[in-house]
Amino acid sequence: MNKEERAKRQSKIRNFSIIAHIDHGKSTLADRILEKTNALTQREMKAQLLDSMDLERERGITIKLNAVQLNYKAKDGEEYILHLIDTPGHVDFTYEVSRSLAACEGAILVVDAAQGIEAQTLANVYLALDNNLEILPVINKIDLPSADPERVRQEVEDVIGLDASEAVLASAKAGIGIEEILEQIVEKVPAPTGDSEEPLQCMIFDSLYDPYRGVIAYIRVVNGTVKVGDKVRMMATGKEFEVTEVGVFTPKTTQRDELTVGDVGFLAASIKNVGDTRVGDTITHAKRPAAEPLPGYRKLNPMVFCGLYPIDSARYNDLRDALEKLELNDSALEFEPETSQALGFGFRCGFLGLLHMEIIQERIEREFKIDLITTAPSVIYKVFLTNGEDMIVDNPSNMPDPQTIDRVEEPFVKAAIMVPNDYVGAVMEICQGKRGTFIDMQYLDETRVTLTYEIPLSEIVYDFFDQLKSNTKGYASFDYELIGYKPSKLVKMDILLNSEQVDALSFIVHRDSAYDRGKVIVEKLKELIPRQQFEVPIQATIGNKVVARSTIKAMRKNVLAKCYGGDISRKRKLLDKQKEGKKRMKSVGSVEVPQEAFMAVLKMDDN
């Protein structure tokens, strides 16, 4: 293509993504848009087409972002090229959303006509505003009996401050309003700016690993043009490769000769080493490089850490490969090797949140067929020592001796919880139980309230979300951001089995609740650890002080079975002999700890 053709084509490109709270109908709307633009034949169409991972389809949530190119003939008779970049809605995957938005000029904001605005809707809107996107509100599910589009339209104006007078009323399920949405995209979303003659700049917004083609980078071309056979350079790593194929997704990968300004597609360059491409990096030509990389994303810091260990220790290297491949596709994951006396070799992994952690575990077990043991999740603590030094602790077993500690600081988050009026009391109770500090309360309308609390992250990590959902019948929605570290009275609690410390069961707890937590956990472990041939004491200790203890009784054989009647001294002798044997066994015996016991440390608040 020559310069004029490229410029004409560029003016007809529209890049947009769809943002919404979980379950407001994002993926269904994406399906309808694909149908309307005839991207697929009827036979290929299936529900939630862009959610390609099995896990996504099972849980009905979008985890990964996806991109597709569509052709649309608008009412003005022109052919437009639309790039739809689908995004997740769950708080743990905000990172995926911010990456998709960086590749767009516009966003469709989907709001449920019955439920109105929820916490995640707001969080995603702010991300879109940060990226200066044109936002088109769409009120979805208007065919529901409980739908109240006018109230929601008012809410969009009041709460977000967007003009919703032209908001499309739609029902993705029934296919109402889809054409209006497409027309608004063509009219209101700006065409990409950029120059096809400038040095090449492509933003990598995702990548995946193909065993035959190497790493495939999903890119958005900002300036310049990239063709097959070009030598390209990754600006962050400085590595150079020759492009073997470029193309677009129509959801299927379709090869093209070149990608130019505004295109969203993929690039493969037989990159075999996973570490050579970084999501958020800029690709440029090796011969005529761009002066500087595109502003990348801010690197997200993991909030939650846990240990992952293969049940079969021979598969340690397989687990490393699995994590490396997942990291390529999920740049928010971090991991480093660690060892535990109880569990052997494994990795300490960092995640954005609990859902993220669960998904990664499930993907490793499914896609790579590795059985895992996971330890209790923890957060990063800052420990200041009496000698003036400070250290960072992300694993409870690395906590220094209590005598040497001056103070411990833990991360706090500001949590915004949206909840119907009737449940305000229940939510406040949960937050106070989690050592939360009340900050603010605002009414959105007559029926809904936003509560703002400062809560230690470690309290949210366990089961805050589950409690919130169950105590508000699923109506509360919740979003949080890190605000920094504050000192807390924290102590490390160790669990001893048969007088031996099990490092993987240690956890850090607030001093005020230490005694209760210790009591609960030893009782729980007593139920979960199978009975042995000898008596096993379970102790919870802080430093060298035991705060709770419980004993698993020994199983024993009835050694008196063969004495019919008989003399008491004869029975005594047999019983003493048995006792002696048990004692010997106890001094050498070790106790197997089942996986449920490690998880019990987490699920303490069920009772």
Curated annotation (Swiss-Prot):
<dbReference type="GO" id="GO:0003924">
    <property type="term" value="F:GTPase activity"/>
</dbReference>
<dbReference type="InterPro" id="IPR005225">
    <property type="entry name" value="Small_GTP-bd"/>
</dbReference>
<keyword id="KW-0378">Hydrolase</keyword>
<dbReference type="Pfam" id="PF00009">
    <property type="entry name" value="GTP_EFTU"/>
</dbReference>
<keyword id="KW-0342">GTP-binding</keyword>
<dbReference type="GO" id="GO:0045727">
    <property type="term" value="P:positive regulation of translation"/>
</dbReference>
<dbReference type="InterPro" id="IPR035647">
    <property type="entry name" value="EFG_III/V"/>
</dbReference>
<dbReference type="Pfam" id="PF00679">
    <property type="entry name" value="EFG_C"/>
</dbReference>
<dbReference type="GO" id="GO:0005525">
    <property type="term" value="F:GTP binding"/>
</dbReference>
<dbReference type="GO" id="GO:0043022">
    <property type="term" value="F:ribosome binding"/>
</dbReference>
<dbReference type="InterPro" id="IPR035654">
    <property type="entry name" value="LepA_IV"/>
</dbReference>
<feature type="binding site">
    <location>
        <begin position="23"/>
        <end position="28"/>
    </location>
    <ligand>
        <name>GTP</name>
    </ligand>
</feature>
<feature type="binding site">
    <location>
        <begin position="140"/>
        <end position="143"/>
    </location>
    <ligand>
        <name>GTP</name>
    </ligand>
</feature>
<protein>
    <recommendedName>
        <fullName>Elongation factor 4</fullName>
        <ecNumber>3.6.5.n1</ecNumber>
    </recommendedName>
</protein>
<keyword id="KW-0472">Membrane</keyword>
<keyword id="KW-0648">Protein biosynthesis</keyword>
<dbReference type="InterPro" id="IPR013842">
    <property type="entry name" value="LepA_CTD"/>
</dbReference>
<keyword id="KW-1003">Cell membrane</keyword>
<comment type="function">
    <text>Required for accurate and efficient protein synthesis under certain stress conditions. May act as a fidelity factor of the translation reaction, by catalyzing a one-codon backward translocation of tRNAs on improperly translocated ribosomes. Back-translocation proceeds from a post-translocation (POST) complex to a pre-translocation (PRE) complex, thus giving elongation factor G a second chance to translocate the tRNAs correctly. Binds to ribosomes in a GTP-dependent manner.</text>
</comment>
<dbReference type="GO" id="GO:0005886">
    <property type="term" value="C:plasma membrane"/>
</dbReference>
<dbReference type="GO" id="GO:0003746">
    <property type="term" value="F:translation elongation factor activity"/>
</dbReference>
<dbReference type="InterPro" id="IPR000640">
    <property type="entry name" value="EFG_V-like"/>
</dbReference>
<dbReference type="InterPro" id="IPR027417">
    <property type="entry name" value="P-loop_NTPase"/>
</dbReference>
<dbReference type="InterPro" id="IPR031157">
    <property type="entry name" value="G_TR_CS"/>
</dbReference>
<keyword id="KW-0547">Nucleotide-binding</keyword>
<dbReference type="Pfam" id="PF06421">
    <property type="entry name" value="LepA_C"/>
</dbReference>
<dbReference type="InterPro" id="IPR038363">
    <property type="entry name" value="LepA_C_sf"/>
</dbReference>
<comment type="similarity">
    <text>Belongs to the TRAFAC class translation factor GTPase superfamily. Classic translation factor GTPase family. LepA subfamily.</text>
</comment>
<dbReference type="InterPro" id="IPR000795">
    <property type="entry name" value="T_Tr_GTP-bd_dom"/>
</dbReference>
<feature type="domain" description="tr-type G">
    <location>
        <begin position="11"/>
        <end position="193"/>
    </location>
</feature>
<dbReference type="Pfam" id="PF03144">
    <property type="entry name" value="GTP_EFTU_D2"/>
</dbReference>
<dbReference type="InterPro" id="IPR004161">
    <property type="entry name" value="EFTu-like_2"/>
</dbReference>
<dbReference type="InterPro" id="IPR006297">
    <property type="entry name" value="EF-4"/>
</dbReference>
